[in-house]
């Protein structure tokens, strides 16, 4: 979104991706994550955290923080930044690193202090093959409980990513959980309440680019050209079960659109080390994301107001907002 009287910075002319040196890469803010991967993956390395959509720009992602499937292990995308350069409101080029005040107010700072122009990113080894396990749950409470059980396995590295979703199923909802590993190890699912329904081995890039098949479908049906009024909030874990159940009771499939879903992902507060990215006070929070793909502009029109209503309800229970959300925000927000 854009504030009243705001400025759009076109960074397309600053999209260079530098050489990979000692598990680091210097990237200009206008580059896309797809372009970053094109430089790092042939070296067997990837950024520790990537957004689900690889065609987002690096600078745009870092302005809001950046949440991805690996956030539960490695934090926000901004937590993978090891140095940055930006232009302040005074027109000065400023460079900063961890420990500098500027470093902490620019990352996820919404461009209020400086516009990021160049960053250095930490890289991690990329698995050759990943295994995507899909589990189906009887209700949201058991899905959230399984996510909590998997946190220790995430820390140990036995699990690379955990992402829950709730998809429309007739007049009801089907909760499902995606567990991603770098080895075919059924034992990693031991003790979970969800019923395994599929396991799919795939190249690392196919998993990182998993949003691409959906985008192709949306483009083919014309839905990609419609507005995408998404909402992302962070729920305190202690209230998550009740909050999610309450919002699902209010939602219908048409509120999300034919390809929409609700995304639920666990985020340990300690994993996120970006001060400007606001999270609830609980040690664990749950990313609650309404992924809306309306069938028409008429269907999309009421969705920003509906997003506002959802946010106002969950905020009373201690939830916080991820600012890359579609509704009109005030200075108080």
Predicted segments with their positions:
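Active-site-adjacent structural patch at catalytic or cofactor/ligand-binding sites
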Residues: 8-10, 188-194, 288-293
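Short, glycine-/Ser/Thr-/acidic-enriched flexible segments
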Residues: 14, 32, 63, 69, ...
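Short acidic-glycine loop/turn motifs at beta-strand connectors
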Residues: 4, 20-22, 87-90, 168-171, ...
């Amino acid at each position: 979104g854009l504030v009243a009287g705001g400025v759009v910075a076109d960074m397309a002319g600053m999209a260079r991706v530098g050489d990979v040196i000692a598990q680091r890469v210097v990237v200009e803010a206008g580059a896309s994550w797809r372009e970053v991967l094109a430089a790092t993956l042939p070296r067997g390395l990837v950024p520790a955290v990537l957004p689900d959509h690889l065609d987002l720009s690096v600078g745009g992602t870092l302005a809001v923080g950046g949440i991805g499937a690996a956030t539960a292990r490695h934090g926000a995308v901004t937590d993978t930044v090891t140095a940055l350069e930006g232009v302040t409101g005074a027109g000065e080029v400023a460079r900063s690193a961890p420990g500098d005040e500027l470093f902490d107010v620019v990352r996820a700072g919404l461009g209020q202090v400086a516009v990021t122009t160049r960053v250095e990113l930490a890289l991690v080894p990329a698995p050759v093959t990943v295994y995507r396990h899909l589990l189906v749950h009887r209700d949201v409470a058991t899905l959230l409980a399984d996510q909590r059980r998997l946190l220790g396995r995430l820390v140990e590295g036995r699990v690379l990513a955990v992402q829950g979703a709730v998809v429309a199923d007739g007049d009801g909802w089907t909760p499902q959980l995606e567990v991603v590993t770098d080895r075919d190890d059924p034992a990693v699912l031991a003790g979970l309440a969800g019923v395994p329904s599929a396991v799919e081995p795939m190249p690392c890039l196919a998993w990182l680019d998993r949003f691409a098949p959906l985008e192709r479908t949306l483009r083919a049906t014309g839905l990609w050209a419609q507005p995408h009024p998404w909402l992302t909030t962070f729920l305190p874990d202690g209230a998550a079960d009740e909050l999610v159940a309450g919002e699902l009771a209010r939602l219908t499939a048409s509120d999300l659109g034919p390809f929409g879903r609700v995304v639920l992902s666990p985020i340990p507060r300690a994993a996120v080390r970006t001060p400007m990215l606001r999270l609830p006070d609980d040690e664990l929070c749950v990313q609650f994301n309404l992924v809306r793909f309306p069938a028409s502009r008429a269907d999309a029109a009421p969705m920003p107001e509906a997003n506002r209503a959802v946010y106002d309800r969950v905020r009373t229970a201690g939830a916080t907002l991820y600012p890359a959300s579609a509704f009109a925000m005030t200075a108080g927000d």
